[in-house]
From Swiss-Prot:
It comes from the Bacteria. Residues 521-623 form the SMC hinge domain. The gene is smc. Required for chromosome condensation and partitioning. This is Chromosome partition protein Smc. One of its GO terms (molecular function) is DNA binding. The keyword Mitochondrion does not apply. Keywords: ATP-binding, Coiled coil, Cytoplasm, DNA-binding, Nucleotide-binding.
Length: 1176
């Protein structure tokens, strides 16, 4: 591939779209410092995938986008494109078929970076793959930037090895090996996970097998329990149906009796209704008489109100007449007063008009004399301003002369200080100590050894972290399992305690016990403990005595003869302690199995259980009948009793069955929970220890990493110090020459400044005298101007005083006119008010004449007579109503007696309805339960008919259901999906076994692949090392005119060893390359780069001022070598050296005529020479 064009747009200083042609094998880039030449090298690195901003001389990747200038706005994006001629098909991969390849990268302000190949968007990895093994890349040896020559020759052996690998083309092998190692690591992790899963699955299979057996037992018990439960429901459904029918018949008879009683009630209600109608008629008569009385009272009240109104109106009109007469007199007096004040105001108005005319004349005279005075003041001010301007010019010139003197003095002082600094710097300037350089080289070697040791320690710690983490996970899993076991036991205990508490709530006895204040007494079973397994036997023998209540004296129970308990209840009195009687030979008394410490209680139970013995099973109990004493019985653990003449099978027949067994299980569970809590605490402690160990290892990794980073920084700092000292030696001579030149320039500048100061001092003295004269004239003008200003101010004050007097006189005249108008309005108002009051007084006289109360007095007497007659009629009507009310109350009491007789009948019907409803609800409940389970009643009835007789007894079925329920409860928590989970786990184990074998095979295959890659890489690296070493040995003498150079390995294993450069120029026997000068290092690095090129020529090479440290002779040899190598490789170089420019076939000039914007000018050297020859 050959580079033909480089296109830039918005990249750093190349804001405008710019095309840099590369038509030949040697293209030089020239231009002044800072014009943007090195930006071309940065652009090539950037488009090849450089992701580190510092390698592009920036702080962030956004810095590559043009950031604006004085006349330009910032660019929105940066774009760089490289165009290659691929006519020979040397490109890798799918791009080998294209004759031209264009690689482009675009970065926008939002941080989006995109790569394109022939306008197809690709990944950064794809760009890397195109140039893999060619030496091209963001960090490849084909791009040599400023300072890279020194970094290359002074690189550590591990860093130099990278260039050798790139030249050998083993990058693709390393990439393949890295991918293979990643796959191998993933495969091993997968294998570890599979093995962990298999171990866990093995333990899980053992648990599932046990759980599957429990699930099988559970399903068998559940099927048997469901069958008996269905039979129980069917029997109860039939019983509830029969009960409902009986209650329905009784309810019909009670309804008939109720209807007969209701008929008698209706007859009495009819008689009551007739009497109530008569009572209503009498009440209406009373209301009518009451209404007539109300009308008479209203008429009396109306007439009395009319009389009172006439009297009140006459009094009110007489008071108003007196008030109007007084107001008329007051208004007449006010009219007289207003006429007198109007006459006085008219006299004042005439006097005020004369004073106003006089004040106006004086103000006009003062106003006419004021302009002349103000004109003299303005003339004096203008003269004074002219003098002030002249004075200011003189002062400005004087200040300028003084400033010139001060500036000259300050510059002379600064030059003196600068001379002292430069002389001090010249005295202190010295070259670095060579011993220090040797010491730094030794320190670097020691630091590298420490770094290797720290890296090994870090690797060991990082390997321990997964082990500690796995141990922590195992401890956490164990602790979680123990916690689950503890939770299971606690849940079982809580359920049993709740059940025990529910049973202890006494049921039907609870109200009776509370009524007799016996609810707080403890039950006997709470004090009993027996050997495990014999709980049912003890309950079968004691029966209701299990829940007996202790009393001090049994005679106290006589009080319950009239109010007996609603359910079975026993009381006991504690006897005195007595010795335990001896048992017959070969028989074990049931009382001997009790674990009781109270001797009185043991005496009581010995009495109750005195003739009860034990046998392990029913067969042995039957066999022991012959040995039983008279009246004795033998009991088995299930509770069945055998005596000499009978066998009694035991079944729980109350809700309190199993109390003793549950109590003992509760106590056992409490002990198990305490033990399990200790186990759980130990497991949590183990988790804490594992967590602590993991944290210690994890925390130790960070300091180890920090130590590795610290040693790496220290070695890097030593390298930087070494490079700095070498550069300081080269720069010290140049700096001394510049200092001497600066001192000479300072002396010449001091002479010029002294002459300038003397000239400014003479001018200052002349201007000082002129300033004194101007200041004297200006002071006189100031005094004269102040006198004129005082005269003008006095005239203006006199004018203002006269104008104010004229204005006040005018205001007084207007005030008198306003007062006259107000008095005239008040006089007219008084006249109007007096006239209105006279009219109103005349109307009042007429109203008083019209008022007369004699007619109302006569009507009032007639109304009082009518009211007396109507009061008597109302009294007669009320007496009739009271008689009828007494009859109505008698009839109503009789009706109420009949209604009360209905209440017992209705209560009976309600009771029967509730009983019928209860039976119906019970029937519906059992029917719903049977329907919900989709039970076939006919088939179940037929099946029950074929069963033994006990299947048709509800008590037996109830006990069987309870027994099966207890057996199911004894199984504990049941995993019903255990069978399915067991089958799924077995299938999963078979799959994981197969997967484990596949992973083992894959690991062997990947390890073989890594060994093969290592073998091929080792062979290729060795061949490359030998070839590059030979080329290096050939090119070094060409560049130096003699001497020798070679490459050496730092270790025996070529896959891990670094590469060191050994170079000795002609006539030198230096032991290390760091003792060479800067120019010698540059030539050595150039020889090494070109040796790499001869092995694996890159498509093109970029050189950025590589010849800067070379003298003319070395530059010429460097140029000859580049020219000879350009036959194989295309060179694009940046240089300020004329000798290097001469070898270029084309020159690309970079300019910056517009500040901050780079532009190019391309020149073909051969064409230029031909044009010059033709012009000559």
């Amino acid at each position: 591939m050959r580079l033909t064009q480089l296109k830039l747009a918005g990249f750093k200083s190349f804001v405008d779209p710019t095309v840099i042609p590369v038509p030949s094998q040697l293209v030089g880039v020239v231009g002044p410092n800072g014009c943007g030449k090195s930006n071309i090298i940065d652009a090539v690195r950037w488009v090849l995938g450089e992701a580190k901003a510092s390698e592009l001389r920036g702080e962030s990747m956004q810095d590559v986008i043009f950031n604006g200038s004085g006349n330009r706005k910032p660019a929105a994006r940066a774009s760089v494109e490289m165009v290659f001629d691929n006519s020979e098909g040397r490109a890798a991969g799918q791009w080998s078929t294209y004759s031209e390849i264009a690689v482009r990268r675009v970065l926008t302000r939002d941080g989006t970076s995109s790569y394109y190949v022939n306008n197809q968007q690709v990944r950064r990895r794809d760009i890397h793959d195109i140039f893999l093994g060619t030496g091209l890349g963001a960090r490849g040896y084909a791009i040599i930037g400023q300072g890279m020559i020194n970094r290359l020759i002074e690189a550590r052996p591990e860093e130099l090895r990278v260039f050798l690998e790139e030249a050998a083309g083993v990058s693709r092998y390393k990439e393949r090996r890295r991918e293979t190692e990643n796959r191998l690591s993933d495969t091993r992790e997968n294998l570890t996970r599979v093995e962990d899963i298999l171990r866990e699955l093995g333990s899980q299979l053992e648990k599932l097998e046990a759980q599957a057996e429990v699930a099988r037992q559970y399903r068998e018990l559940q099927a048997d329990g469901e069958k008996k439960q269905f039979a129980l429901w069917l029997l109860k459904e039939t019983g509830a149906r029969d009960e409902r029918q009986r209650k329905s018949q009784e309810m019909a008879q009670a309804q008939t009796n109720l209807e007969a009683a209701i008929a008698n009630l209706r007859s009495g209600e009819a008689e009551l209704e007739s009497r109530r109608q008569a009572h209503y008629a009498a009440g209406d008569a009373v209301h009518a008489a009451q209404g007539q009385l109300y009308e008479a009272n209203a008429q009396v009240s109306r007439l009395e109100a009319e009389i009172r109104h006439v009297v009140d109106s006459r009094n009110r009109l007489q008071a108003r007449r007196e008030q109007l007469q007084q107001q008329i007199a007051e208004w007449d007096a006010q009219q007289t007063h207003c006429v007198e004040q109007i006459a006085q105001a008219e006299d004042d108005l005439a006097t005020g008009a004369a004073r106003t005319e006089e004040a106006r004349a004086l103000a006009e005279e003062a106003h006419a004399s004021l302009p002349a005075v103000e004109a003299r003041v303005r003339d004096a001010a203008a003269s004074r301003d002219e003098m002030r301007s002249s004075l200011a010019r003189v002062e400005q010139n004087l200040a300028l002369a003084a400033q010139t003197q001060r500036d000259a003095d300050r510059q002379l002082q600064n030059l003196e200080q600068r001379r002292e600094r430069l002389q001090q710097e010249l005295r202190e300037l010295h070259a670095p100590d060579p011993v220090r350089l040797e010491q730094l080289a030794g320190d670097r070697a020691a630091g590298e050894d420490q770094l290797e040791e720290a890296q090994q320690e870090l690797a060991a710690l990082e390997a321990r972290v997964p082990e500690a983490d796995a141990e922590r996970s195992r401890a956490q899993a164990a602790a979680q399992q123990d916690a689950q076991n503890l939770a299971r036991l606690e849940a079982r205990l809580a359920a049993l305690v709740k059940l025990q508490e529910d049973v202890q709530k006494q049921g039907a006895l609870e109200p009776w016990l509370a009524k007799h204040e016996l609810a707080g007494l403890g039950r006997l079973w709470q004090k009993l403990h027996i050997e495990p397994g014999w709980e049912n036997a003890l309950e079968a023998v004691l029966r209701e005595r299990m829940a007996a209540l202790e009393v001090r004296n049994l005679d106290w129970s006589r009080a319950f003869a009239e109010d007996a308990p609603p359910a079975r209840l026993a009381f006991y009195q504690m006897p005195a302690a007595a010795p335990t009687p001896a048992a017959p030979q070969g028989l074990t008394p049931l009382a001997s199995l009790l674990r009781i410490t109270d001797p009185d209680l043991r005496t009581l139970l010995n009495d109750w259980l005195g003739n009860i013995y034990t046998a392990p099973d029913l067969g042995q109990a039957l066999a022991a009948r012959a040995t039983l004493p008279a009246g004795a019985a033998c009991v088995v653990p299930a509770g069945h009793l055998v005596d000499a003449h009978s066998v009694r099978f035991y079944a729980p027949d109350s809700e309190q069955a199993g109390l003793l067994a549950r109590q003992q299980e509760i106590e056992n569970l409490q002990r198990e929970i305490k033990a399990q809590q200790l186990i759980a605490d130990q497991a949590r402690a183990a988790v804490a220890r594992a967590e602590s160990a993991w944290q210690q290892v994890s925390q130790a990794v960070a300091p180890a990493r920090q130590r590795v980073a610290e040693i790496t920084r220290r070695v890097h700092d030593i390298q930087l110090e070494h490079s700095r000292l070498q550069q300081q030696a080269e720069q010290s001579g140049e700096r001394a020459a510049r200092l001497r030149q600066d001192l000479e320039e300072i002396s010449a500048h001091e002479e010029d400044l002294r002459a300038t100061r003397e000239e400014a001092e003479a001018r200052f003295e002349a201007l000082d005298a002129e300033l004194a004269e101007h200041q004297s004239r200006f002071a006189d003008a100031e005094i004269a101007g102040e006198d004129l200003a005082a005269q003008a101010e006095a005239a203006r004050a006199r004018l203002r005083e006269l104008e104010r007097a004229a204005q006040e006189a005018e205001f007084a005249e207007r005030g008198v006119q306003s007062r006259i108008a107000d008095l005239q309005r008040n006089r007219q108002l008084a006249a109007d008010q007096s006239q209105r009051a006279a009219v109103e007084l005349e109307q009042l006289q007429a109203d008083l004449a019209d008022l007369d109360a004699s007619a109302s007095q006569a009507g009032l007497q007639d109304a009082l007579e009518v009211r007396a007659e109507r009061e008597e009629a109302l009294s007669r009507a009320r007496q009739e109503l009271d008689n009828l009310s007494a009859l109505l109350r008698g009839a109503d009491e009789e009706r109420m007696q009949q209604e009360r007789a209905l209440e017992p009948l209705r209560a009976r019907i309600t009771e029967l309805q509730l009983q019928e409803q209860a039976a119906r609800l019970a029937e519906e409940q059992f029917t719903e339960q049977l329907n919900a389970r989709e039970v076939d009643r006919e088939a179940l009835a037929q099946e029950l008919a074929a069963m033994p007789d006990e299947w048709r007894r509800a008590n037996w079925l109830q006990s069987e259901v309870g027994r099966i329920s207890r057996q199911i409860d004894s199984l504990g928590s049941v995993n019903l999906a255990a069978l399915d989970e067991l089958n799924a786990s077995r299938e999963r184990k078979e799959f994981l076994d197969s997967q484990q074998q596949d992973l083992l095979t894959a690991i062997d295959t990947l390890e073989d692949a890594i060994r093969k890659i290592d073998r091929e890489t080792r062979e290729l690296l060795q061949a490359t090392f030998d070839t590059v070493n030979g080329h290096f040995g050939e090119l070094f003498p060409k560049l130096f005119g003699g001497g020798e150079a070679k490459l050496t390995m730092t270790g025996d294993e070529i896959l891990d060893a670094g590469v060191q450069v050994m170079a000795q120029p002609p006539g030198k026997r230096n032991s290390t390359i760091h003792l060479l000068s800067g120019g010698e290092k540059a030539l050595t690095a150039t020889a090494l780069v070109f040796a790499l090129f001869k092995l694996n020529p890159a498509p093109f090479c970029l050189l950025d001022e590589v010849d800067a440290p070379l003298d003319d002779a070395n530059t010429e040899r460097y140029a000859n070598l580049v020219s000879s190598m350009s036959e194989q490789t295309q060179f694009l170089f940046i240089s300020h050296n004329k000798i290097a420019m001469q070898m270029a076939k084309q020159l690309v000039g970079v300019t910056m005529q517009e500040q901050g914007v780079s532009r190019i000018v391309a020149v073909d050297i051969d064409s230029a020479v031909q044009m010059a020859a033709e012009a000559a």
